Amino acid sequence: MSFALALLLQTAPAATPPAAAEPCDKPVYMVVQGRTLDRARMMAYGKALAQSEIYQRLGGYYITLPQPVAVFEGDVPPDYVNLTVRFPCLANARAFWNSRVYQETILPLRQNPPAGDYTVTVYAEAPLRADMAGRVEAGRFLADFSQAGEPQVEPKP
């Protein structure tokens, strides 16, 4: 081994081990709400979303249907939807949103011009109240859903 190579190896920083993945065990809820402007295009969007199986890969699933079963206060337009998707953690919700398949193939189906006027927000799951322990299931995920293999796009600022 040459002297220069030996010197370089002595002064080179040691490779840092990859960071351990955060546990994906704090469920979040992605809420999509707003008015549907083009139902046919939204149906095509929903079909593409289902066919991609991205929710299945990331542990996402619907916990509500988009239309209310009752309105207790206020006026809800007939084209208004509120759809909630549960993910096992924020990282998986982000992996869904920033996935190449969603951003480049599925999302454009409802944009330009917009097929709906929606907001998409994510909320943490509230802790189970002590008085509810033993009365309801905690709703935890029993399988791991890794976001590591899902191709991503750069998140928008």
Language-model segment annotations:
Residues 2, 25, 113-115:
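A generic structural signal for short, non-catalytic loop/turn and secondary-structure boundary residues
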Residues 4, 41-44, 101, 105:
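Exposed alpha-helical structural elements
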Residues 1-10:
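Bacterial N-terminal signal peptides
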Residues 82-131:
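Surface-exposed, polar helix/loop patches in the mature regions of secreted/periplasmic/lumenal proteins
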Residues 9-81, 88-92, 123-157:
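Short S/T/G/P-rich N-terminal loop/turn motif that feeds into the first structured element of a domain
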